[in-house]
């Protein structure tokens, strides 16, 4: 995605840029920052975090609220943790569909100040022409969980033990293949 040299001339292009600036919480006109925030999240990190945060899809939050990334909220739709301390008021964000959970996760990593180091390291890898992999970035996610460095060690372990790095170069295509079944 190269935005810096492009002149946006059509109304549709301008509308798209305005929408992305809002979505990624970027100051008006800062296309360089938009490019940094719109970059990929390595597949292995997303899979490892979803597995860890949702108990491999078996947690109450995943089953009742499509919450596979364990994102906290204090004012949104959510599910209260059963073992939450009495002086705490957070909930786990709840979603109507899994796709909404994934989009919120993407927006969280790409916009929240707690993940600035994640975005900076990812951008450094991009600028050096290096592969952007989960194992290269997990150390930047210490703020994702209260356990800090221990959390990043667990993510690395999940990625390695389950060979999630094998999925780094996978590309999903938006197509339908018709298959005939023999009766």
PLM ranges: what are they?
Residues 1-48, 52-183:
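Catalytic cores of secreted/periplasmic lytic hydrolases that degrade extracellular macromolecules
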């Amino acid at each position: 995605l190269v935005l810096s040299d492009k002149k946006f001339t059509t109304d549709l292009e301008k509308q798209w840029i305005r929408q992305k600036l809002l979505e990624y919480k970027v100051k008006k006109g800062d296309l360089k920052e938009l490019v940094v925030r719109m970059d990929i999240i390595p597949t292995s990190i997303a899979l490892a975090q979803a597995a860890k945060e949702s108990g491999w899809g078996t947690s109450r939050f995943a089953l009742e609220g499509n919450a596979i990334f364990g994102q906290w909220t204090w004012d949104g739709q959510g599910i209260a943790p059963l073992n939450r301390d009495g002086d705490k008021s957070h909930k786990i964000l709840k979603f109507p569909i899994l796709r909404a959970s994934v989009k919120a996760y993407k927006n969280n990593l790409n916009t929240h100040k707690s993940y600035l180091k994640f975005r900076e390291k990812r951008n450094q890898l991009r600028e050096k022409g290096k592969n952007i992999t989960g194992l290269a970035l997990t150390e930047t996610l210490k703020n994702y969980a209260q356990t800090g460095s221990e959390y990043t060690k667990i993510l690395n372990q999940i990625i390695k033990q389950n060979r999630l790095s094998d999925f780094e170069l996978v590309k999903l295509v938006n197509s339908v293949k018709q298959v005939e079944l023999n009766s």
